[in-house]
Design a protein with these regions (language model features):
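Alpha-helical bundle regulatory/interaction domains
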Residues: 1-102, 106-108, 113-118, 132, ...
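Short, basic, alpha-helical segments at the C-terminal edge of helix-turn-helix-like DNA-binding modules
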Residues: 137-147
Length: 167
């Protein structure tokens, strides 16, 4: 499992406020390779291409969390309307296939379905998601295993592990 990246802004009234994007979500806002953000804390000051000073000031003026959420949503939607950069369709399709298979799908079968060679596929996937296809599949598989453990009443952990794709 990996740690998540944090996008952080500091003002007098806000100590930390975070936004979590779906895979390929942040790549719609920036051309930066997302693997550079994995396991790191990123300040809004380092993302001047997306977040300007007016955003930080307006966010700091809000007293309630719901108002801050509204400001973030409005700002990101307005930015997206002006600067939309669609994620690579091959990568988006591969992410959907991994999610649908709950991480059990092999990287080879993903490459065959998206019609890319291994090196190019892995490079694009890592650029748009921050992870290699194998790393992302492992994360999805682990999340599925946790969900199975939470919802399954069976005392047999081996069966649960096999159902989650660990064999």
């Amino acid at each position: 499992m990996t740690k998540y990246s944090e996008l952080v802004t500091y003002t007098e009234s806000i100590h930390m406020f975070g936004v979590r994007f779906l895979p390929c979500g942040l790549s719609c806002f920036t051309n930066l390779p997302l693997h550079e953000f994995v396991n790191s804390r990123v300040s809004t000051n380092e993302m001047k291409a997306v977040f300007d000073d007016t955003f930080i000031e307006k966010l700091g003026e809000q007293k309630h969390v719901t108002d801050r959420i509204r400001v973030v949503e409005e700002y990101l939607l307005a930015y997206l309307a002006r600067h939309y950069q669609p994620a690579d369709s091959h990568v988006a399709m591969a992410v959907n296939m991994i999610n649908h298979s709950k991480g059990k799908r092999s990287v080879r079968s993903l490459m065959d379905d998206v019609c890319l060679c291994q090196r190019h596929f892995e490079r694009k996937f890592k650029h748009y998601t921050g992870f290699t296809p194998k790393e992302y599949s492992r994360i999805v598989k682990f999340k599925n295993a946790v969900e199975l453990l939470r919802t399954t009443t069976s005392a047999n952990l081996l069966t649960t592990a096999v159902d989650a794709g660990y064999y």
